[in-house]
Amino acid sequence: MKVKEIRELTTAEMLDKEKQLKEELFNLRFQLATGQLENTARIKEVRQSIARIKTVLREQAN
């Protein structure tokens, strides 16, 4: 997700999206461990999206 897209979400939507991405990251890591993951770059994309959401949430808290 782009930061612009994240900023358009409400706080509840951001928290929900973060939860979904964490679940996806868990599944991707599981697939990587079992040798089923084809697109390993997706792990990096998901991690960066989680970080972007956390950054925007932190900015809004201040």
Swiss-Prot record:
<comment type="similarity">
    <text>Belongs to the universal ribosomal protein uL29 family.</text>
</comment>
<dbReference type="InterPro" id="IPR001854">
    <property type="entry name" value="Ribosomal_uL29"/>
</dbReference>
<dbReference type="InterPro" id="IPR036049">
    <property type="entry name" value="Ribosomal_uL29_sf"/>
</dbReference>
<dbReference type="GO" id="GO:0006412">
    <property type="term" value="P:translation"/>
</dbReference>
<keyword id="KW-0689">Ribosomal protein</keyword>
<dbReference type="InterPro" id="IPR050063">
    <property type="entry name" value="Ribosomal_protein_uL29"/>
</dbReference>
<protein>
    <recommendedName>
        <fullName>Large ribosomal subunit protein uL29</fullName>
    </recommendedName>
</protein>
<dbReference type="InterPro" id="IPR018254">
    <property type="entry name" value="Ribosomal_uL29_CS"/>
</dbReference>
<dbReference type="GO" id="GO:0003735">
    <property type="term" value="F:structural constituent of ribosome"/>
</dbReference>
<keyword id="KW-0687">Ribonucleoprotein</keyword>
<dbReference type="Pfam" id="PF00831">
    <property type="entry name" value="Ribosomal_L29"/>
</dbReference>
<dbReference type="GO" id="GO:0022625">
    <property type="term" value="C:cytosolic large ribosomal subunit"/>
</dbReference>
